[in-house]
Each structure stands twice: as structure tokens, then as C-alpha cells.
Amino acid sequence: MMSKLGVLLTICLLLFPLTAVRLDGDQHTDRPADRMQDIATEQHPLFDPVKRCCDWPCTIGCVPCCLP
């Protein structure tokens, strides 16, 4: 019985090696500074920092819009 379990375990490890599983150390690091380069709403000339939105329509590229 034990030899059958050993053979089954060996086959499973050969088919699905532990290196195929992504561990936490293999994950990409989160880089908030890189993400902020794509989002430039705060630097938009029509952005109102008090309201935290734009008074103009969203079609001009400033989001979030104050107007519906």
C-alpha cells in the first residue's frame, strides 16, 4: 500500500512540480509611482482640488467629472 502511495506521489510531483506554482516571492512588486505616471488628473488645468473633480465634461480628458 505504501509503495503505491509513493509511486502516486512521485508521478504527481513529476507532472506538477512545485516550481510551477507561483509563490509570493515570485509576484511582481507593486510600484505606485509608476502607476501615478499614467494618471495625471491632479495636474490637469481644469481640475478643481477643492472639489476633487473637473467642472468640464469628461470628453476633454479630465476625470472624475463634477458634472453628470
Swiss-Prot record:
Keywords on record: Cleavage on pair of basic residues, Disulfide bond, Hydroxylation, Neurotoxin, Secreted, Signal, Toxin
Principal location listed in the UniProt entry: secreted
Family matches, as Pfam families: Conotoxin
Modified residues (4-hydroxyproline): P64
Expression across tissues: Expressed by the venom duct.
Propeptide: 21-52
Annotated signal sequence range: 1-20
Compartments, as annotated in UniProt: Secreted
Recorded superkingdom: Eukaryota
GO function terms (MF aspect): ion channel inhibitor activity; toxin activity
Disulfide bridge positions per record: C53-C66, C54-C62, C58-C65
InterPro entries assigned: Conotoxin
Annotated Gene Ontology cellular component terms: extracellular region
UniProt domain comment: The cysteine framework is III (CC-C-C-CC). Classified in the M-2 branch, since 2 residues stand between the fourth and the fifth cysteine residues.
Family statement drawn from the similarity comment of this UniProt entry: Belongs to the conotoxin M superfamily.
Protein name: Conotoxin TsMMSK-021
Species assigned in the record: Conus tessulatus
